[in-house]
UniProtKB/Swiss-Prot annotation:
GO BP terms, alphabetized: hydrogen peroxide catabolic process
Pfam families: Globin (PF00042)
Positions annotated to bind heme b: H64, H93
Subunit structure: Heterotetramer of two delta chains and two alpha chains.
Stretches of the chain forming a coiled coil according to its record: none
Protein's UniProt name: Hemoglobin subunit delta
Phylogenetic classification of the source organism: Eukaryota, Metazoa, Chordata, Craniata, Vertebrata
Family: Belongs to the globin family.
Length: 147
């Protein structure tokens, strides 16, 4: 659960309504893999990830980034039950994929940067504060199975 005020919920959903999940999802996952190169080990089956340029243009990375942000957007519809919403993904990432749960926090941080880059002045400090709460809540929900 994320404790957001009514105003924060409105800010989050209003901005999210403008998000192009294909574009921003690809950028967010690509940035994660470039900035934190050790995360690439989870995506070795995606092909060439040897350079930043290769990552940024890898069709499988871009498609998976879209999938990630689509799931994130679904989570925004269930802010009062993030653990339930992400229970299956938490189990998958823990039991099958063995993803370090810290990576969820890192991806959340990258997503905030991508949103700020794309929305500029519209991504005010108040909007950022609301999104920081949301990405922390989603990361916590995804890490739930690990506890």
């Amino acid at each position: 659960m994320v404790n957001l005020t009514a105003a924060e919920k409105t800010q989050v959903t209003n901005l999210w309504g403008k998000v192009n999940v294909k574009e921003l999802g690809g950028e967010a996952l690509s940035r994660l893999l470039v900035v934190y190169p050790w995360t690439r080990r989870f995506f070795e089956h995606f092909g060439d990830l040897s350079t930043a340029e290769a990552v940024l243009h890898n069709a499988k990375v871009l498609a998976h980034g879209e999938k990630v942000l689509t799931s994130f957007g679904e989570g925004l519809k269930h802010l009062d039950n993030l653990k339930g919403t992400f229970a299956d993904l938490s189990e998958l990432h823990c039991d099958k994929l063995h993803v370090d749960p810290e990576n969820f926090r890192l991806l959340g941080n990258v997503l905030v940067i991508v949103l700020a880059r794309h929305f500029g002045k519209e991504f005010t400090p108040d909007v950022q504060a609301a999104y920081e709460k949301v990405v922390a809540g989603v990361a916590n929900a995804l890490a739930h199975k690990y506890h």
